Amino acid sequence: MKGNIMQLSHTELQSRKKKIAWWQSDALKWLVISLLSLFTCYLIVLMYAQGEYLFAIVTLILVSLGLYVFANRRAYAWRYVYPGVAGMGLFVLFPLICTIAIAFTNYSSTNQLTFERAQSVLLDRQFQTGKTFTFGLYPSDNQWRLQLTNPDDGSLFISEPFSFEATGEQKVMVAPTNTAQTSEPASLRIITQSRQALSSLVAILPDGAELRMSSLRQFSGTKPLYTLGADGKELINQQTGVKYWPNPSTGFYQAVNADGQWENEKLSPGFTVSIGWKNFLRVLHDEGIQKPFISIFIWTILFSVMSVTFTVAVGMVLACVVQWDSLKGKAIYRVMLILPYAVPSFISILIFKGLFNQSFGEINLMLSHLFGIKPAWFSDPITAKSMILIVNTWLGYPYMMILCMGLLKAIPDDLYEASAMDGAGPFQNFFRITFPLLIKPLTPLMIASFAFNFNNFVLIQLLTNGGPDMIGTSTPAGYTDLLVNYTYRVAFEGEGGQDFGLAAAIATLIFILVGALAILNLKASKMNFD
């Protein structure tokens, strides 16, 4: 009996092993995990070698956690949660942390490099000394020869054969010659293609002078413009003797006078340094930033509130109209009213931009014929804001209308029948029955719509580009700019350079403001529901 049981269990075990397909085997799983680990390690090493330490660390953490979750049976339950958590961390938390970190630095178009990299760029600069020779590049078997010509007396120098395959700096001796090369010289295209190799070529004259490529047709005597001081930080100008020190407050190498005071002269490129709360203080105290920031913040709030109000009002009224039982052809009206929602928003915005054209737009042509007026839609702040609200209402009402059409189906007909028996009219039914029953379920969606319009970058960028521009501001700002558009213009359109640190500080303030407004809206909606 026991033998039969053992034989049966052995048979069942064999059959279960046979049922496991090859793509479900542990060997294949570990092979895939091993290959993924090797590929990830390769990517991390590349990121680290290129100086992208932060991205390398984030990639290492996410992939390591992912491999542990999907390879360990104890973490089986986390397999369903980890992709969402990793995505939120990578696309929400990581950019947020980076933005906040940049807000405390002077990171900009003039201060993008690290200190070591900026110092290296400055040390690589050369200045021209001595004579300038024209050159020609001539083939010699499988190598090349460099022929230098002195433009003053026509004397010739020819180099020993060299190859472009050498790495690093390559020194070649040149000797005087009375015979010019008779072979065909290399074309400008070949010289351009080999410019990097020629730039690392050093031609040494018989007197020991060193010549380097200074243009596509010339070799000149050059020397490093700056040399490094004994402390490893000071830079000394070889032409003027001026000494420069790294200024940790500005992120530039600046000249220092005899008293040890900083002078205005500074060297570019600069380097990134931590400046604490200076960017935030600029927003709060610099009048050139404070005035447009406050004005833009107020307009952003008004735009968001009015956009939600208008879209809900128009959408709710149209939903009630197309749901009216006595209306004939309701299906046609529904399709026509929903069409704006089917057209991509950026196409509609550009169409409206043409319609509102002040000189040739159809809207101004019609207003001119009917009323004799031509509003300045793009040059007057009030009319520009009115135009934006009109276009945004057109873009947003179909969504609210669809929601209201669905919610109207949930209202019992008994309520309207009872109100009809009491002698109530359509307006009383709307304000006493329909509106109160629709507004509560719409509240969360209205909050979401408010948050969306608060950061409605595309509408402003395509329709007005923030214009008309404000006068007397230290940063680019317009009357129709939202906070997100203002941040974009500070970061990428500044006349004095792209100030990413200031833009990150404004973006951080926007994040705090939107979060605070969302909390207030949620609390208010909770009180209404209670």
UniProtKB/Swiss-Prot annotation:
Gene that this sequence comes from: malF
Pfam families reported in the protein's UniProt record: BPD_transp_1, MalF_N_TM, MalF_P2
Protein origin, superkingdom: Bacteria
Protein name, per record: Maltose/maltodextrin transport system permease protein MalF
Protein family membership: Belongs to the binding-protein-dependent transport system permease family. MalFG subfamily.
Main location: membrane
Keyword Translocase belongs to the record: no
Oligomer status and interactors: The complex is composed of two ATP-binding proteins (MalK), two transmembrane proteins (MalG and MalF) and a solute-binding protein (MalE).
Residues of the ABC transmembrane type-1 domain: 297-521
One Gene Ontology molecular-function label: ABC-type maltose transporter activity
Keywords: Cell inner membrane, Cell membrane, Membrane, Sugar transport, Transmembrane, Transmembrane helix, Transport
Transmembrane segment boundaries: 27-49, 53-70, 83-105, 296-318, 331-352, 386-408, 429-451, 500-522
Its job: Part of the ABC transporter complex MalEFGK involved in maltose/maltodextrin import. Probably responsible for the translocation of the substrate across the membrane.
BP terms from Gene Ontology: maltodextrin transmembrane transport
CC terms in the record's Gene Ontology section: maltose transport complex
Organism: Yersinia pestis
Intervals, Periplasmic compartment: 50-52, 106-295, 353-385, 452-499
InterPro entries, A to Z: MalF_N (IPR035277), MalF_N_TM (IPR048464), MalF_P2 (IPR029345), MalF_P2_sf (IPR047103), MetI-like (IPR000515), MetI-like_sf (IPR035906)
Keyword Glycoprotein applies: no
Cellular compartment(s): Cell inner membrane
Lineage: Bacteria, Pseudomonadati, Pseudomonadota, Gammaproteobacteria, Enterobacterales
Membrane disposition: Multi-pass membrane protein
Residue spans, topological domain Cytoplasmic: 1-26, 71-82, 319-330, 409-428, 523-530
